[in-house]
Amino acid sequence: MPVLSDDAVLVVGLGNPGPNYAKTRHNLGFMVADLLAAKDGATFKPHKKSGAEATTIRLGGRAVNLAKPRTFMNTSGPQVAALAKFFSVPPANVIVMHDELDLDFGTVRLKLGGGEGGHNGLRSVSQSLGTKDYLRVRLGVGRPPGRKDPAAFVLENFAKAETDQVPLLCEQGADAAELLIRLGLEAAQNQVHAWG
């Protein structure tokens, strides 16, 4: 049984706006959202009711609302909730794509609900939606070396050794979102989690 109902679907990439953050680990969600839009020939436009940037794409065989909040990561929840309300998307049909410290760099995992793992963007989304029971595409960035502050680590650009692999990670994130919509959570997890 697919986890997504026949209601509208909202796919959100999390990140920070502006060129200073464009290539940081924390902006992986934005990078995957940009890739999904480009693959469908779509362009993000300001969404007046939410303040986010949004577009509509075909993904997993259906029309999907794709968005990037335009506030900073830690306050992205209200824009996500406003989009969900505007498009009549239940929380179980909201898919949030985000960087994940608790996964090795390059790993992609799918999840429904659960904790935020210290991710303030997810915390903001959970508070604004009034539930943690939404879908996540978790994009592994790994833990910082030594005693480096994780908050500083995610705001840095990728290490030189990682940079060449970022496009593949974004492709896999985009594929994971599509499988999630097409197959539902469990079947999509079976495929995505076998990627390594």
Curated annotation (Swiss-Prot):
Name where it's found.
Cytoplasm
One Pfam annotation, family name?
A: Pept_tRNA_hydro
One CC-aspect GO term: cytoplasm
Q: What InterPro entries is this protein classified in?
A: Pept_tRNA_hydro, Pept_tRNA_hydro_CS, Pept_tRNA_hydro_sf
The EC number(s) attached to this protein equal 3.1.1.29
The active site consists of 26
Question: What GO terms in the biological process aspect are recorded for it?
Answer: protein quality control for misfolded or incompletely synthesized proteins; rescue of stalled ribosome
Enzyme class (EC, first level): hydrolase
Annotated residues that bind tRNA are located at 21, 72, 74, 120
- What keywords would UniProt list here? Cytoplasm, Hydrolase, RNA-binding, tRNA-binding
Site residues, Discriminates between blocked and unblocked aminoacyl-tRNA: 16
The molecular function terms in GO held by this entry are: peptidyl-tRNA hydrolase activity; tRNA binding
Q: Where is this site: Stabilizes the basic form of H active site to accept a proton?
A: 99
Q: Which PROSITE patterns match?
A: PEPT_TRNA_HYDROL_1 (PS01195), PEPT_TRNA_HYDROL_2 (PS01196)
Among NCBIfam families, the record links this protein to: pth
Q: How does it assemble?
A: Monomer.
Family, according to the entry, reads as follows: Belongs to the PTH family.
Q: What is this protein called?
A: Peptidyl-tRNA hydrolase
